[in-house]
Amino acid sequence: PKNIHKAIDIIVKGKSAPIDSFRVNNHFACMLSGIGLDATIAHRFAEQKRRGLLTYIRISALSFLKTGAYPVSIKTNTDNIIQTDIRFVSIANSNQFGNHVTIAPGASLHDGLLDIVVVQKRNRLLTVMSVLIQILFGKIKPVASASNQKKTILYFQSKEINIENPNLAPLHIDGEPIETAKQIHINITPSALLMIQPL
């Protein structure tokens, strides 16, 4: 909670429970990581002298209109391979996307799994509509395979993924811009932290 008195009350009276974390090329991550459009926004927002919601909306709109697609190959721990051009890929450990938006509604800090959302290259109007539908009604779907990529959004779970990123799509970890790489390895660390929670 933002209220300091409520926060202190939870610290004093709450209970600790284990939560998962994950690693992105050996960098610690807790909530959400991504490559592509959302990372582009994170990098550009970090460069701004003025912060705040209006700046974030402006940067997001400009980035959406100007950022192209990136070719990637994603391999899961079950050896499924997805080869596609993406607007962005989000790797979620929790369902919070930012500003109370949930891109991965089924994500949990306690299940030992990463939720991966792959937004493929489509026309911009279809992308917006598909992302909004995912935010409002999204559910976990079966792991997508290379032969099943007709939908704009692919949504699946995995303990580990490897992303080939030949065109160096930008990368962020928990909203912070990070130097990208052509090979990105991401894996879950179950019950890595203790977090104080309300009773």
Predicted regions and their residues:
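ATP/nucleoside-binding phosphotransfer catalytic cores, i.e., glycine-rich phosphate-binding loops
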Residues: 76-78, 83, 108, 120-199
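Short acidic/glycine-rich loop or secondary-structure boundary segments that cap or lie
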Residues: 38-41, 82-84, 97-100, 124-128
